[in-house]
């Protein structure tokens, strides 16, 4: 028993040391650049192939081949990626969404390129750099960890690295060469990736898809380390590796045996799932940037051409449509990304899980019920599983959400699709009468048309506008009354249903369930393809499906991945291309109006009927620093109340407590007799509390009228004239109402934001520095509007630094100092 424990521990240390190298590389790269390098596994795979090429094919000695691979090629690839891709992105603002798209593009490009160069098959003759004993690997890991800790803590470069991590712009102003720091980080990260690939290749399948996925799984150790601590990453990797090895000795009897064995063989996947779904996430931004998902106006002729191309196989192809039947099914799967990522802006890398589950459930159920009924039931069963990724999306943003969705995909692949207990003996048959490829293809086209119409209706309607608002500006959407958490769940559930429908059709068309068709690497490829062809465009999904299927069928394996990866990299690197396309065929702007008339609000309820918003003893602290120290404030109806004070006085914090975006530690917020302290922002909006933002919160992808309409729809205003009245009041009733909000002048955008707030017919209006960015004439116009609103009985609170504006409009002025009103 002791000998077995020792042997298993050694095996676990071997795996854990490779995982530790990955963790170190990811942490150092992230600390130096702010980029979570999802292409780490692909770099590892390329280096493993390069070493094999040098040693096995070209008969180089191992030592010089390893030196060239690890000390020249791997760091050189890292520096190349930094200089050509990620450094320009950091100069342009380091948008996490664009960086993620570029990183996925690099991953897919390297995987596709490797498949092109070396073929998609597995290789079993990779050279071993060290012996089978783990001590050599452990020594390398310990030495590298000690080097990283020493450099980061006790050298000048370490101080520069910490400065860049804390504030890259300020570090550059302080004379630090941030580009050099980033290049060193990328070189070291690529070196550890190459070393990981070289060490793992002799013991696993060396193929373009398997090895990158293995490295992706051990991202868990970097997440556990919060992307900051090399020591924590190394310790976590070694512990998980040893625990995974020890679990292989468990052989419980009964139905639990396959599951226990699966967990024992995939403990890093379990760790990734827990780290991604339970531990606090990394990343801050929640949505794909608007330039990345920008919708291109599609002329009717393009739809006509697409329809003709999809119908061509029915008339001109032979009876064997094996390739063609994949296109409509895959297009439906990719439509799920149009809903979730394109319209909703949520980064989802796990749609392969839902597509595969749709195929799997269809196969299971078709053994008992007719095939079409089995497909329908599969869709209904898989749709609620969208909550697995939708729930984390409520709290997780950006990179954290990407990791959560990727973790769900990896776990589903390892614990369901790859297990014999789930897929052994599974066959899929087509419905009666659809055995012929032509008939089946025609049914697929009909279902694709229905799916396109359903998604088009969703995008054009109230829900579609709310999704676009959530994508463009989540806090602004909440302020407009959009129930963002519920809407995210809806997007992921609808996306799961579409993916399940497409997955079921795809496997029925091929008459088999192929786990490889739904592996996580393919999910990254699907995501990249949809982003490349326009994530918010309905035509993008069929086009991406045709591109992927056509290239894979008509060319050497890997062409589709390489092409899509290159295009995704370029889209992440040059998002302006999508921005230019989004302006295509946009109607010309009308000439600017020479004057804007401000209309009085129509007569409304008596002012006495409006509830009073009040804060009672509100306290809030950040650690030991007290921001609000028992603040009392009332915002009475029919009056303009102003809140002024110096920077750091607590004005904005109190404002957020009133809006619902912050919850106080003590005290309460009341609206009339109701205690609304615990109510979220969108719920307060629906009570009649509207707000604007210091930094303008409009939805650039929507027109001016759609921006205002969201305020009425989400505020549940039943009067159809509410939108028109708000547009007229703010001087937006002319041709400007049909223009997208993107690119409009600041003064116009301020009026759009205020018009959206007023369209909800609020009782109380909260304004955070509403005059910011306005010229004198625009500020005077704003003052007239606010006085008119108060005269009509509305309660108005203004947080403002412009004391002239405050003196002009305020009935009551409160001064804040050090978290108190006095």
Predicted segments with their positions:
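Catalytic Walker B motif of ABC-type/P-loop ATPase nucleotide-binding domains
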Residues: 765-769
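A short, surface-exposed alpha-helical micro-motif characterized by mixed small hydrophobic
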Residues: 806-808
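Conserved ABC transporter NBD signature motif
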Residues: 667-674, 687
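The feature captures the beta-strand-to-loop junction immediately N-terminal to the Walker
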Residues: 644-646
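Transmembrane alpha-helices and adjacent helix-loop boundaries
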Residues: 15-18, 22, 41-44, 91-126, ...
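Helix-to-loop junction immediately C-terminal to a conserved catalytic motif
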Residues: 659
């Amino acid at each position: 028993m002791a000998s077995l424990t020792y042997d298993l521990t050694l095996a676990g240390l071997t795996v854990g040391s490779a995982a530790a190298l990955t963790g170190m590389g990811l942490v150092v790269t992230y600390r130096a650049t702010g980029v979570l390098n999802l292409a780490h596994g692909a770099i590892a795979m390329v280096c493993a192939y390069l070493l094999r090429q040098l040693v096995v094919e070209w008969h180089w000695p191992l030592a010089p081949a390893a030196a060239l691979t690890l000390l020249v090629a791997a760091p050189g690839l890292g520096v190349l990626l930094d200089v050509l891709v990620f450094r320009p992105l950091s100069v342009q603002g380091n948008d996490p969404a664009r960086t993620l798209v570029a990183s996925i593009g690099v991953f897919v490009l390297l995987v596709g390129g490797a498949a092109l160069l070396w073929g998609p098959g597995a290789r079993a003759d990779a050279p071993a750099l060290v012996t089978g004993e783990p001590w050599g690997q452990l020594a390398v890991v310990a030495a590298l960890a000690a080097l990283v800790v020493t450099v980061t803590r006790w050298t000048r470069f370490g101080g520069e690295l910490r400065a860049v991590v804390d504030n890259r712009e300020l570090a550059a102003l302080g004379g630090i060469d941030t580009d050099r720091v980033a290049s060193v980080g990328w070189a070291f990260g690529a070196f550890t990736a190459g070393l990981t690939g070289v060490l793992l290749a002799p013991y696993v399948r060396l193929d373009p898809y398997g090895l990158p996925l293995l490295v992706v799984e051990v991202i868990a150790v970097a997440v556990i380390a919060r992307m900051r601590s090399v020591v924590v990453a190394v310790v976590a990797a070694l512990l998980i590796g040893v625990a995974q090895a020890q679990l292989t000795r468990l052989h419980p009897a009964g139905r639990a045996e396959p599951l226990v064995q699966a967990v024992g063989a995939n403990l890093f996947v379990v760790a990734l799932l827990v780290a991604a779904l339970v531990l606090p996430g990394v990343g801050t931004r929640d949505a794909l940037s608007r330039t990345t998902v920008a919708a291109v106006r599609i002329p009717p002729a393009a739809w006509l051409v697409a329809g003709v191309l999809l119908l061509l196989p029915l008339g001109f192809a032979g009876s064997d449509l094996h390739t063609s039947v994949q296109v409509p099914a895959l297009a439906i799967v990719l439509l799920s990304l149009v809903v979730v990522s394109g319209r909703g802006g949520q980064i989802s890398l796990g749609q392969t899980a839902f597509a595969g589950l749709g195929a799997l459930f269809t196969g299971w159920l078709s053994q008992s019920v007719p095939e079409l009924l089995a497909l329908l039931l599969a869709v209904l069963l898989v749709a609620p599983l969208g909550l697995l990724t939708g729930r984390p999306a409520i709290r997780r943003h950006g990179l954290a959400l990407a990791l959560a969705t990727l973790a769900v995909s990896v776990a589903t692949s390892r614990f369901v699709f790859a297990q014999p207990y789930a897929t052994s003996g599974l066959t899929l048959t087509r419905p009666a009468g659809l055995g012929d490829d032509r008939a089946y293809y025609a049914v697929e086209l009909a279902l694709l048309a229905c799916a396109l119409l359903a998604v088009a209706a969703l995008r054009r309607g109230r829900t579609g506008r709310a999704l676009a608002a959530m994508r463009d500006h989540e806090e602004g959407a909440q302020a407009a009354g959009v129930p963002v958490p519920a809407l995210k769940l809806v997007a992921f559930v609808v996306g799961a249903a579409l993916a399940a429908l497409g997955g079921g059709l795809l496997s029925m068309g091929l008459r088999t369930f192929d786990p490889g068709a739904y592996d996580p690497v393919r999910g990254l490829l699907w995501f990249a393809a949809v982003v490349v062809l326009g994530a918010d465009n309905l035509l993008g999904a069929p086009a991406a499906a045709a591109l992927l299927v056509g290239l894979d069928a008509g060319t050497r394996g890997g062409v589709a991945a390489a092409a899509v990866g290159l295009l995704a990299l370029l889209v992440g690197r040059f998002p302006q291309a999508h921005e230019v396309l989004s302006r295509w065929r946009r109607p010309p702007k009308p000439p600017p109006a020479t004057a804007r008339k401000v209309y009085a609000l129509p007569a409304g309820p008596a002012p006495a009927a409006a509830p009073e918003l009040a804060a009672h003893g509100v306290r809030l602290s950040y650690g030991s620093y007290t921001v609000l120290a028992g603040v009392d404030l009332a915002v009475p109806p029919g009056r303009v109340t102003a809140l002024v004070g110096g920077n750091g006085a607590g004005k904005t914090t109190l404002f957020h407590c009133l809006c619902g975006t912050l919850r106080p530690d003590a005290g309460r917020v009341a609206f009339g007799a109701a205690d609304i302290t615990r109510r979220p922002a969108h719920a307060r909006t629906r009570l009649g509390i509207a707000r604007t933002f210091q930094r303008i919160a409009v939805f650039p992808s929507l027109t001016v009228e759609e921006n205002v309409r969201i305020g009425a729809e989400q505020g549940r205003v039943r009067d159809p004239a509410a939108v028109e009245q708000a547009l007229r009041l703010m001087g937006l009733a002319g041709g400007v109402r049909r223009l997208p909000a993107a690119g409009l002048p600041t003064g116009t955008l301020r009026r759009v934001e205020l018009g959206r707030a007023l369209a909800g017919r609020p009782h109380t209006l909260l304004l955070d520095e509403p005059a910011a960015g306005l010229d004198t004439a625009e500020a005077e116009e704003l003052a007239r509007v606010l006085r008119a609103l108060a005269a009509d009985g509305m309660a108005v609170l203004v947080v403002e630094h412009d004391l002239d504006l405050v003196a002009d409009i305020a009935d009551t002025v409160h001064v804040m100092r050090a978290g108190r009103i006095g």
